[in-house]
Amino acid sequence: MSANKNIWIIRLGVAFVCVAIGAAQANEKDGSAVTSGNWSLLGGGNEQHYFSALKDVNKSNVKNLGLSWFTDMEAGDGLVGNPLVADGVIYQGGPPGKIYANDLKTGKNLWTYTPEVQYDKDTSWTGFWGTHVNRGLAVDDDNVYIGSYCKLLAVSRTTHKLTWSSQSCDPKKMQAITGAPRVGGGKVFIGNASGDFGGDRGHLDAFDAKTGKHLWRFYTMPGDPSKPFENDLLAKASKTWGTDYWKYTKGGVSPWDAITYDEASDTLYFGTDGPSPWSPAQRAPDAGDELFSHSIIAVDASTGAYKWHFQTVQNDGSNMSATMHIMLADLPVEGVSKRVVMTAPKNGYFYVLDASTGKFISADHYVPVNWTKGLDPKTGRPIPSNEANYWERPGEMTIPLPGDVGGHNWEAMAYNPELRTVYIPSTLVPVTVVASKDTGELDLDYYYGMRPDATIKTQGDLVAWDPLLQKEKWRAKRSLPVNGGVLATAGGLVFQGTGDGHFEAFDANTGEKLWSFHVGGSILAAPTTVEVDGDQYLIVASGNGGASGMRGIPRLMNNLQSQGPARLLAFRLGGKTELPITSTPDFPKPQYPKPTSAMAESGRHIFNANACGACHGFNAEGSTPGLPDLRRSDKLDLAVMKSIVIDGAFKPLGMPGHPHISDADLQALQAFILQKAWTAYDTQQTLKTSDTGAQ
């Protein structure tokens, strides 16, 4: 059901009148249409359009694009942030808050800042996990800003030393910083992540950019109702969480990525995650909307005072976060140019909201959805459907769409104001969910859609979307569901990296693929483009990493051909540099016999219950080069495993100990890993035999 009919009938009548308005908007405010040698703000400007007015590289000559240089980076957990460029230097962030500064023209590393991370003995799982995820950094005239182990760091661009460090969350309370900070108005803004465990309340902080002084905090959910609320807003929000809600949930609703600053109105827009635990059956029975979960929130950037919110999903059970990329633009609404917010959260809908009031303007879905029957055309509120409500059917398999991975995750969209088109890296991952009849524990299969018998197939697309008509213009299918962020240019091109390791260019009008280059590693980062000395450079970071890998589903975002090292790559017309050939080593024959199926299945439950798969992959296949493929491990001796898994021997490396795991549980874990190791080895040997026989 489309939720845009009422206003678009009016809008179509004024479409021709609005053409002139659109042309005048081609050079957007706040530097979104980048023409210089700098790309110092995330997405190229405060509006975060990921659009450049550069057009030296265009549809007629993009076939001549070649690699100018590449640099292999010491980043075991991959690079996924949008590279920023200021004064001839590329700044790239990586885990655990590392800053790389490289020369724009040569790729030579100029300096690297590595933060000191000393894990507290009480560091939570999320605190450890978060140090393996970094989605970028921020830059201003003085400093580079990055998150690390719940701290916001400012590092001088001149001295390359720490200017200040400020605490923003508590790694002992299931919190971490994984998103890129944003800068504006002399301030630095940062949110936090909970890893979906909800150990503490989500909040967004503002710091003075020069001194690191904490200026304000906005809590995204109410706290313990037995204590005074921080303000009347949270007191009112508490009424939406149900009776005795603090008995069921003590956190979540994290603003872990999307933050957008509007200089003209001094407004900060950010998105929030969902409540914890995931299942509504495990939260207050009479819970309502649970504000401000899954919301777009606008606050005064100077004070943190609330302006408005728009909630995309109420009382959610499928982790359909609204923390995805938020853009600002000027669009013709009923014949008048209006400042709008555009966003495509996980729930599968693309929204256009009034930036001043938060009022719903329009929305429609860009991937299949079954969690709602549609949206109210006036308010945008979802019309209830129980098709995705697994918590109402314990013991039965349910496939919520688009589900936990989302129709669009954190990877950046792009907006071409000249064509008035948004380009969405969309995802469809049908995840089967079965809630235990006894405990309510969720059993999820993220790889269901890759099975031959799947009724709904896993799919990734690059979607060109008309935000006025809420209509698809074209769709380019990708080989894997999780792919990189997008860049649009005035050269009539759209650039995107892919999970299978390709960097590609498309015709912005038709979706025709015009150019492709295999970089050897998975790409989640959005590209950057700048011009220097008459050459237009396209810059992109590669290397397995990011939330998708860290959520234990690496097969959705890479394959055997895209597991190369983390790299920074620059392309220009006439580039002639060649990449070295990389290969994946064979699986070694496991050193222990095959386990029984029953023991391995017991180990699978222990593996999942302790969130081992979130770092090491649900099939123990490893998420990033920095988190080992356990199927290849030479540390499966039970005594060695005990020292690592139970006693925490690798705690300094970010691997927590699990003292609650028994010796019997450890044996079951060993059996599960061995089963996966033998499966990988046997499959490899079968393929080798088949290849030999075919010759």
Swiss-Prot record:
From the UniProt record, report the name of the gene that encodes this protein. Answer: luh
PROSITE patterns reported for this sequence:
CYTC
Q: Which residues form the signal peptide?
A: 1-26
Which EC numbers does the record give?
Answer: 1.17.2.2
What is its EC class? oxidoreductase
**Annotated catalysed reactions:** lupanine + 2 Fe(III)-[cytochrome c] + H2O = 17-hydroxylupanine + 2 Fe(II)-[cytochrome c] + 2 H(+)
Residue ranges of the Cytochrome c domain?
A: 598-677
Gene Ontology CC terms, in alphabetical order? periplasmic space
Keywords noted in UniProt: Heme, Iron, Metal-binding, Oxidoreductase, Periplasm, PQQ, Signal
Q: What is this protein called?
A: Lupanine 17-hydroxylase [cytochrome c]
Q: Which organism is it from?
A: Pseudomonas sp
Q: Do you know which SUPFAM superfamilies this protein is assigned to?
A: Cytochrome c (SSF46626), Quinoprotein alcohol dehydrogenase-like (SSF50998)
What GO molecular function terms would the record report?
A: alcohol dehydrogenase (cytochrome c) activity; electron transfer activity; heme binding; metal ion binding
Classification via CDD domains: PQQ_ADH_II
Q: Where in the cell is it found?
A: Periplasm
Q: How does the cofactor bind to this protein, according to its record?
A: Binds 1 PQQ group per subunit.
